[in-house]
Amino acid sequence: MDNEETIKLDQFLKLMCVVQTGGEAKMLIQNGDVRVNGSVEVRRGRKLVMGDRITTMGENYVVEEAE
């Protein structure tokens, strides 16, 4: 993923196996249980870029380049 590429927050949560479905991602995000770069994020369509830090359910994730 270069600096121009993005992934939506709900897609990222599914990719990282935090949730199994888009509906689960929606609920987690809308409940305020997801932080992006330290701030609560309630938009499931939030575009993430390389280096963004996501925290949810006691776990930390970083958006990194796809292999």
Question: What are the language-model segments listed below?
Answer:
Residues 4-50:
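A basic, amphipathic helix-loop patch mediating RNA/tRNA/ribosome contacts
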